[in-house]
Amino acid sequence: MAKHLKFIARTVMVQEGNVEGAYRTLNRILTMDGLIEDIKRRRYYEKPCRRRQRESYETCRRIYNMEMARKINFLMRKNRADPWQGC
């Protein structure tokens, strides 16, 4: 039962027989939650050393993306007089 509890909150209602739209909505929800990627990854056995490498890479990528987003947000602030000074 514990394996199925995570699927309780992913119920999508089919409105007016629109099965394709409901399927797209469900697929988007599962992708945003990371479940599709997790299921694909667990399809085959992953050696412990490869798992550590993957988790380390994902951590580095997450840190890089957060820092890059912070720098871009700093550069794109609207309260500066002229964001393109000297051009």
UniProtKB/Swiss-Prot annotation:
Component of the mitochondrial ribosome small subunit (28S) which comprises a 12S rRNA and about 30 distinct proteins. One of its GO terms (biological process) is mitochondrial translation. This is Small ribosomal subunit protein bS21m. It holds the Pfam family Ribosomal_S21. Keywords: Mitochondrion, Ribonucleoprotein, Ribosomal protein. GO terms for molecular function: structural constituent of ribosome. The keyword Ribosomal protein applies. The keyword rRNA-binding does not apply. It comes from the Eukaryota. One of its GO terms (cellular component) is mitochondrial small ribosomal subunit. The lineage of its organism: Eukaryota, Metazoa, Chordata, Craniata, Vertebrata. It is found in: Mitochondrion. Gene3D superfamilies: Ribosomal protein S8. Belongs to the bacterial ribosomal protein bS21 family.
